[in-house]
């Protein structure tokens, strides 16, 4: 299921670097994202993760319903700043690479991060 396994390690590192650089610039420009209602962001992402987890085994990362949820996920991320294609892929890599983020997301479903990896990468490649 891991769509970004087809992407080169150099490109994946570029995605990680883009996330770090874009987030750092945004944090500086917005005084630590003070404009963002973090409680609402977390509630909105929770709604998406619960919807995905409810029937994850029957979903395809590329189906229209899933991609609509990922579009909503991206729109929530845009409340902080507008991530580039590479930074958005970098975000899902962070979910996979960071133990706390992996545990958090997989708390919704044991395969959530693996699924998000494919769904977000697909969304980024086709929509951003």
Question: What role is predicted for each listed range?
Answer:
Residues 1-128:
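Amphipathic alpha-helical "stalk" segments
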């Amino acid at each position: 299921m891991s769509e970004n396994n087809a992407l080169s390690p150099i490109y994946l590192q570029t995605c990680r670097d883009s996330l770090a650089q874009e987030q750092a610039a945004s944090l500086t420009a917005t005084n630590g994202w003070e404009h963002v209602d973090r409680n609402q962001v977390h509630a909105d992402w929770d709604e998406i993760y619960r919807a995905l987890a409810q029937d994850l085994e029957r979903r395809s990362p590329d189906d229209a319903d899933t991609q609509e949820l990922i579009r909503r996920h991206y729109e929530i991320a845009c409340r902080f700043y507008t991530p580039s294609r590479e930074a958005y892929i970098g975000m899902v890599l962070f979910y996979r690479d960071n133990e706390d983020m992996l545990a958090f997301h997989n708390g919704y479903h044991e395969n959530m991060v693996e699924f998000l990896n494919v769904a977000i990468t697909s969304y980024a490649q086709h929509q951003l």
